UniProtKB/Swiss-Prot annotation:
This is 3-methyl-2-oxobutanoate hydroxymethyltransferase. One of its GO terms (cellular component) is cytoplasm. Its main location: cytoplasm. GO terms for biological process: pantothenate biosynthetic process. GO terms for molecular function: 3-methyl-2-oxobutanoate hydroxymethyltransferase activity; magnesium ion binding. The gene is panB. The lineage of its organism: Bacteria, Pseudomonadati, Pseudomonadota, Gammaproteobacteria, Enterobacterales. It comes from Shigella flexneri.
Amino acid sequence: MKPTTIASLQKYKQDKKRFATITAYDYSFAKLFADEGLNVMLVGDSLGMTVQGHDSTLPVTVADIAYHTAAVRRGAPNCLLLADLPFMAYATPEQAFENAATVMRAGANMVKIEGGEWLVETVKMLTERAVPVCGHLGLTPQSVNIFGGYKVQGRGNEASDRLLSDALALEAAGAQLLVLECVPVELAKRITEALAIPVIGIGAGNVTDGQILVMHDAFGITGGHIPKFAKNFLAETGDIRAAVRQYMAEVESGVYPGEEHSFH
């Protein structure tokens, strides 16, 4: 199978072809996803909650991300693999480069970092040194203590304009992908249309170029609070492979996320 690349996603955006992505943390699920044609995966710091059992993503280390990245890469050798740089792993551009090198050596094709215009120098430095960057705006879980919880971001003119400005700044600095989390559909549409790079949404309506879900949310195995934007595809199909195929099909057709999964 031909490898999926950043250029593949760029072509999807140009062709207005929606695409599905998912988090993965181990060999077995990565192989299953790849076998079903789901070829864009993220080793997310969400593993702190879903795999390690913490109440936030903050305890996750670069070593944790590298370990899981290597496992996922073995299961899905041809996927486009993103890896999060966890909390405090990119406080300076130099630190970001050192930690990005670690996860790239483990098998990542691209690193994802959370934050807006303050990251411009970091994004430039990484991009100039052949480390592709995915930005992450909106609800950025590493900032949970600043936000005072997991809340929708970008409501109101000032907040929405700031997020659009952040998105444009990240793109100008060299970011090649952007994740938008928990923002109003109207803002997600503005940002997706304003950027030349692909935008992946989670809790951002069906107006973005792609969608991502935490694997555990997509299969209904999350303990505790279930996000509004989540859908349990396993409950509808009763078979995990069929659930993966249904998730992909609903994203590609624009059925998921529906109005009931979206914010305004």
